[in-house]
């Protein structure tokens, strides 16, 4: 009995399901012998329309039963060799199968003559087999690796002709595959026609029409089939609906399944512009907007500057100087009262800017010695002032790392600096050009000055008039609403700002904290989670609103400590630097004078890490970048005499909070720890940022895959939208960057697994728990659709469980890549393992084949319009939501089967194995699923918006406004910070080695590789095992009956 319990998917092992799951129901599939798996799979047409057949989960919901598998540790599963998803040649149309006499006898009770005909048709297919390829994990991250695809693939996206040839050849390869399948289909139809009953001439006539269509498609060229395949599929779909259940309708489904391979390719290519040299150049321009740095997988945290684009002499001359820190600026010195600069110095800056604007047009500025001399004069005056200043006031020695600028900040300035830095970062988040970023910083400085002036926070009598005069420069649309300022306090300030916590930061990165505020309290415990349920520190991207900043500035900031005139000087310098055209003569000298001015302003600042220091450092960094660019593009001989002085300026600029050469993030800034999961279109790795110690999840995608799909512009457009938003049920994006071959997306790290992993263990969920999960999914889809984004690839794998137990939807910006893999390659993922003498080994190998190909070949969650290759919209997501709800309640998708073409036929027929209603499912849940799974998209629930879904009786009692604040039924309890054992990937199940590895310390040798990661309450464990046995017996009984 104990051995039997261990075989039942390892449910006897400890697992981590909370006691909040009141009624645990388990999945209907098991790893034991089944009547269906005792022999080869034989496809048969559906004859009884009301037949309810519960099919075992055929794509990865099962674990191995061997004893060696149970001894592997969590980490060894990933370090061991695994089988890649494309480790074999494209399979043929079908594989041979030998049906046992007992099974045929049982099926004969409920089948007619048509069934025997279809069995003989299936037996005509030749046998085939696949080799189980092995690929080392060490090649996962490299630019090379993977298995060759059946179509020509370019070696680099820079080779335009080779790339375009690869793009155009995709449909040609699809045509060749379809022709082979059509040839087999024609032979099968001929054999079926010979045995048809002569008393049914209608069936014979329809079969002849199918023969004519198949032959015509085979005779067409690739161009002709591309132009006519959509109309052919639409006509076949219409005729199929008119057929009655039987052999002819099954033949219609088979032909549709073959031809939709072409229509899906056409659909994805039609949604974008034709692939030619012009569109490819547009793509390259779009891709170049993402910063590209060469990848270096070494352990050194140094950034590889080989791809910076600057000449060698400039990197040696200036680049190395930016890596040295001015430690004197971090030392604590005695503070004296600040002497306000006289009006002459302040007016000099404005006169210099006015002279440049008046004498030379702004769109084509030029510079002469007077303007440059004016800038140097201002710098000399600042230097004279600084000679009488002892230094900056730091007031303490404790420092912490800001999660935004990643620089050390005095502890007592952490709260205001975090807000100011986030606000400054907002100025540059959507700006690419240096001049645009300078103008944005200048605009925000003007708003700060306006808020100070309008509330009488001035230090000079005539300052207010000058500020009011300048206020017209700022953008009117970005001006704050004065009436809202006083209505918002400190809590309102942080409404849109990330919490300043160091959730799950390594101890080596934490600092002693003595701050007695809300922010300081968060820092005191390094394992405090964020309010969003993420382990990733969430203080690095979200930024406050304009009115929030002014409210905080007026109510919380100490105005006497920040000099208003220095802010005005920073604004002038940023404006002058942005108006400089470095293609004109004298631009280098002028920018260098601006850099000297800003360095003088920074030296006069009394407080570190506040407005002057934060904005000034960012402006200085941008000016340095512009200066180096100007030196690269211009050969101004007049600047040769100032080389020594410019070197001093560049060397001093290295003390700014932002280093110039480190402005753009790359993969070298992260330490790759281990893989988390593998998906249909990318791999996800757990990584730690070297500077802060924060954990992130990095998704790695191949550039060529995106180019091959010809959908890069939409992907980048969705990414640009989602990277700036924050929603409690969507996974956050933090960074995106590229190397030569890959695109990297850095997302928040959620170590609670996903709904697929949860269902993998518990089988199915109570309706109350499923209602909350689906309600959160509805809100996520509602938000995505408001951004004009269709997910298209919704499934339990993409619903991650956050640290607080709530779900977060992922892959929404890149789901179309996975969708293409899921739909185009459906027909190539068939179980074609040759029969073995040992039925147990054959059943195990057959199951492994289905698991290995499931993630890229299952159409379980796809809407009919996507499978048929027709136009689709938001309604496709609501279809998938209905599939997910059915799976949460029953444990299996409604249309699942052992082969993709059978799933395809089930979806078109709408045949579902409903559980007992209302015993196992309520009437409200059944009605919601029925209305979501309507074949016509315009009639589907949700076609007119999410409001009609939210108003369904199934969601009665759901508090939509406070759903994210409710306590979740299942809250993950990871063993450590970097514990990824809650993830059970569809790929990882077939990728792990069957042999025990040597690294198994700290784990139970008797626990299964997936099962041992959950900790289940003893009562729930016993209940789950008992329930599992009941469902397994019921499952076998249903198989025998039907």
From Swiss-Prot:
EC number(s) given by UniProt: 2.7.11.1
Active site: 793 (proton acceptor)
One Pfam family, short name: Pkinase
PROSITE patterns found in the cross-reference section: PROTEIN_KINASE_DOM (PS50011), PROTEIN_KINASE_ST (PS00108)
Domain AGC-kinase C-terminal: residue ranges: 956-1042
Family annotation (SMART domains): S_TKc (SM00220)
Species whose genome carries this gene: Arabidopsis thaliana (Mouse-ear cress)
Residues recorded with modification Phosphoserine: 854
SUPFAM superfamilies referenced in this protein's UniProt entry, alphabetically: Protein kinase-like (PK-like) (SSF56112)
Chain residue ranges for the region called Disordered: 1-75, 90-115, 297-327, 830-850
Family: Belongs to the protein kinase superfamily. AGC Ser/Thr protein kinase family.
Zinc finger regions, C2H2-type: 402-421
Recorded catalytic activity of this chain's protein: L-seryl-[protein] + ATP = O-phospho-L-seryl-[protein] + ADP + H(+); L-threonyl-[protein] + ATP = O-phospho-L-threonyl-[protein] + ADP + H(+)
Domain Protein kinase stretches: 670-955
InterPro entries xref list: Kinase-like_dom_sf, Prot_kinase_dom, Ser/Thr_kinase_AS, Ser_Thr_kinase_AGC
Entry keyword annotation includes Electron transport: no
Class of enzymatic activity (EC top level): transferase
GO MF terms held by the record: ATP binding; protein serine kinase activity; protein serine/threonine kinase activity; zinc ion binding
Binding site for ATP: 676-684, 699
Name under which the protein is recorded: Probable serine/threonine protein kinase IRE4
Compositional bias annotation for Basic and acidic residues: 1-10, 102-115, 314-327
Keywords annotated in UniProt: ATP-binding, Kinase, Metal-binding, Nucleotide-binding, Phosphoprotein, Serine/threonine-protein kinase, Transferase, Zinc, Zinc-finger
């Amino acid at each position: 009995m104990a051995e039997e319990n261990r075989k039942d998917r390892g449910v006897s092992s400890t697992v981590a399901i909370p006691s909040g799951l009141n009624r645990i129901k388990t999945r209907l599939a098991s790893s034991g012998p089944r009547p269906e798996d005792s022999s080869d799979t034989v496809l048969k047409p559906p004859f009884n329309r009301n037949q309810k057949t519960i099919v075992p989960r055929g794509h990865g919901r099962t674990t191995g039963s061997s004893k060696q598998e149970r001894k592997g540790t969590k980490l060894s599963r990933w370090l061991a060799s695994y089988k890649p998803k494309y480790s074999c040649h494209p399979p043929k149309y079908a594989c041979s199968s030998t049906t046992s006499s007992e099974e045929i006898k049982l099926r004969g009770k409920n089948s007619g003559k048509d069934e025997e005909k279809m069995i003989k048709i299936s037996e005509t297919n030749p046998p085939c087999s696949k080799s189980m390829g092995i690929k080392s994990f060490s090649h996962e991250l490299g630019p090379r690796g993977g298995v060759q695809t059946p179509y020509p693939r370019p070696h680099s996206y820079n080779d335009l002709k080779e790339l375009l040839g690869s793009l155009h050849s995709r449909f040609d390869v699809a045509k060749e595959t379809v022709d082979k399948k059509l040839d087999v289909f024609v032979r099968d139809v001929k054999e079926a026609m010979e045995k048809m009953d002569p008393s049914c001439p209608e069936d014979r006539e329809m079969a002849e029409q199918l023969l004519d269509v198949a032959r015509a498609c085979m005779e067409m060229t690739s161009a002709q089939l591309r132009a006519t395949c959509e109309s052919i599929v639409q006509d076949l779909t219409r005729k199929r609906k008119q057929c009655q259940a039987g052999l002819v309708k099954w033949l219609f489904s088979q032909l549709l399944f073959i031809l939709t391979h072409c229509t899906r390719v056409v659909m994805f290519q039609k949604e974008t512009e034709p692939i030619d040299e012009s569109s490819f150049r547009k793509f390259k321009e779009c891709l170049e907007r993402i910063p590209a740095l060469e990848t270096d997988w070494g352990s050194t945290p140094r950034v590889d500057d080989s791809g910076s684009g600057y000449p060698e002499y400039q990197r040696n001359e200036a680049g190395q100087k930016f890596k040295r820190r001015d430690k004197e600026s971090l030392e604590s010195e005695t503070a004296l009262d600040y002497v306000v600069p006289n009006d002459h110095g302040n007016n000099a800056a404005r006169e210099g800017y006015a002279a440049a604007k008046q004498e030379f047009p702004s769109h084509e500025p030029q510079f002469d010695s007077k303007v440059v001399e004016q800038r140097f004069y201002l710098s000399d005056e600042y230097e004279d002032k600084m000679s009488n200043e002892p230094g900056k006031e730091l007031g303490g020695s404790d420092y912490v790392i800001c999660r935004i600028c990643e620089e050390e900040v005095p502890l007592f300035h952490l709260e205001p600096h975090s807000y100011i830095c986030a606000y400054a970062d907002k100025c540059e988040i959507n700006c690419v050009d240096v001049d645009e970023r300078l103008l944005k910083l200048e605009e925000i400085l003007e708003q700060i000055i306006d808020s100070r002036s309008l509330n009488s926070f001035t230090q000079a009598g005539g300052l207010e008039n000058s500020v009011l005069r300048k206020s017209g420069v700022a953008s009117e649309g970005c001006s704050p609403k004065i009436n809202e300022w006083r209505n918002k306090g400190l809590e309102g300030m942080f409404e849109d700002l990330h919490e300043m916590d160091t959730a799950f930061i390594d101890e080596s990165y934490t600092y002693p904290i003595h701050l007695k505020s809300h922010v300081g309290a968060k820092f005191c415990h390094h394992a405090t989670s964020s309010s969003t349920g993420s382990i990733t520190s969430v203080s690095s991207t979200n930024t406050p609103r304009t009115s929030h900043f002014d409210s905080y500035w007026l109510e919380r900031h100490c105005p006497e400590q920040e000099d208003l005139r220095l802010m005005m000087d920073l604004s002038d310098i940023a404006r002058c630097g942005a108006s400089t055209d470095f293609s004109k003569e004298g631009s280098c000298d002028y920018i260098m004078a601006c850099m000297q001015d800003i360095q003088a302003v920074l030296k006069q600042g009394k407080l570190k890490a506040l407005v002057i220091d934060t904005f000034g450092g960012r402006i200085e960094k941008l000016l340095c970048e512009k200066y180096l660019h100007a030196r690269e593009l211009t050969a101004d001989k007049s600047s040769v005499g100032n080389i020594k002085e410019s070197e001093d300026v560049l060397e001093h600029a290295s003390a700014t909070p932002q280093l110039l050469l480190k402005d753009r993030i790359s993969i070298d800034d992260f330490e790759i720890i281990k893989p988390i999961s593998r998906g249909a279109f990318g791999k996800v790795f757990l990584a730690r940022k070297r500077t802060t110690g924060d954990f992130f999840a990095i998704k790695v995608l191949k550039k060529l895959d995106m180019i091959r799909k010809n959908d890069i512009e939409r992907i980048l457009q969705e990414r640009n939208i989602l990277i700036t938003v924050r929603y409690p049920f969507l996974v956050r994006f933090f960074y995106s960057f590229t190397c030569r071959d890959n695109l990297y997306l850095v997302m928040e790290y959620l170590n609670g697994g996903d709904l697929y992993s949860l269902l993998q263990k518990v089988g199915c969920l109570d309706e109350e728990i499923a209602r909350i999960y689906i309600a959160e999914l509805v809100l996520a889809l509602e938000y995505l659709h408001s951004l004009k984004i269709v997910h298209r690839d919704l499934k339990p794998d993409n619903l991650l469980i956050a640290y607080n137990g709530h779900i977060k939807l992922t892959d929404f910006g890149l789901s179309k890549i996975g969708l293409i893999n899921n739909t185009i390659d459906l027909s190539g993922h068939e179980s074609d393992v040759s029969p073995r003498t040992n039925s147990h080994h054959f059943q195990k190998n057959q199951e492994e084949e289905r698991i290995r190909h499931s993630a890229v070949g299952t159409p379980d969650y796809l809407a009919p319009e996507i499978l048929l290759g027709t136009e689709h919209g938001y309604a496709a997501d609501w279809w998938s939501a209905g599939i997910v709800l059915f799976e949460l309640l029953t444990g299996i998708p409604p249309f699942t089967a052992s082969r993709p073409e059978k799933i395809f036929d089930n979806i078109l027929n709408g045949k579902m194995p409903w559980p007992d209603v209302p015993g196992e499912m309520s009437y409200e849940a059944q009605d919601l699923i029925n209305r979501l799974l309507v074949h016509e998209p315009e009639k589907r629930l949700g076609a007119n918006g999410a409001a009609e879904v939210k108003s369904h009786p199934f969601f009665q009692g759901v508090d939509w406004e406070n759903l994210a604040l409710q306590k979740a039924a299942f809250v993950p309890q990871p063993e450590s910070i970097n514990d990824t054992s809650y993830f059970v990937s569809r790929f990882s199940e077939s990728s792990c080695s069957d042999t025990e590895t040597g690294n198994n310390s700290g784990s139970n040798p008797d626990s299964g590789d997936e099962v041992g990661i959950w900790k289940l309450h003893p009562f729930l464990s016993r209940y789950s095992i008992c329930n599992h046995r009941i469902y397994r017996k019921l499952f076998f009984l249903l198989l025998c009956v039907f």
